[in-house]
From Swiss-Prot:
The modification Pyruvic acid (Ser) is found at residue 62. The active site is at residues 62, 67, 82. It comes from Archaeoglobus fulgidus (strain ATCC 49558 / DSM 4304 / JCM 9628 / NBRC 100126 / VC-16). GO terms for molecular function: adenosylmethionine decarboxylase activity. Its EC number is 4.1.1.50. InterPro entries: AdoMetDC_fam_prok, S-AdoMet_deCO2ase_core, S-AdoMet_deCOase_pro-enz. Its cofactor is pyruvate. One of its GO terms (cellular component) is cytosol. This is S-adenosylmethionine decarboxylase proenzyme. Binds 1 pyruvoyl group covalently per subunit. The keyword Phosphoprotein does not apply. One of its GO terms (biological process) is spermidine biosynthetic process. Is synthesized initially as an inactive proenzyme. Formation of the active enzyme involves a self-maturation process in which the active site pyruvoyl group is generated from an internal serine residue via an autocatalytic post-translational modification. Two non-identical subunits are generated from the proenzyme in this reaction, and the pyruvate is formed at the N-terminus of the alpha chain, which is derived from the carboxyl end of the proenzyme. Keywords: Autocatalytic cleavage, Decarboxylase, Lyase, Polyamine biosynthesis, Pyruvate, S-adenosyl-L-methionine, Schiff base, Spermidine biosynthesis, Zymogen.
Length: 112
């Protein structure tokens, strides 16, 4: 029995200006959640000094989290839904469009 889909991804070679500041990361994540038609319940973001961001969006279907390391051009993403699994794929594609990584690797897990 499959109850959800989980994508874990590492994006490499992301431009620093896209991932260094909380307000930019927040804007991208919130837009992706909205466009992927995920049901946002709440969110928390943390700006690190001198740069880097962690954010978690609680969605009714599960969660989306992001961790950034601008000094390495690195973004770690975690997207999980126990709802419509196509929304996870849509969210991941939107993140790729927004962050434009030079390369990435990702794992797709069917949960359950």
């Amino acid at each position: 029995m499959i109850v959800g889909r989980h994508i874990i991804a590492e994006l490499y070679g992301v431009k620093e200006e896209l991932i260094a500041k909380e307000e930019v990361v927040r804007s991208i994540v919130e837009e992706v959640v909205d466009k992927a038609e995920l049901t946002k319940v709440g969110s928390v973001y943390k700006q690190f000094n001198p740069h880097g961001v962690t954010g978690i969006v609680l969605i009714a279907e599960s969660h989306v989290s992001i961790h950034t390391w601008p000094e390495y051009g690195l973004v770690n993403l975690d997207i999980f839904t126990c709802g419509d699994t196509s929304k996870v794929e849509k969210a991941f594609k939107l993140f790729l469009e927004k962050f434009k990584p030079e390369s990435y690797r990702h794992y797709v897990l069917d949960r359950g």
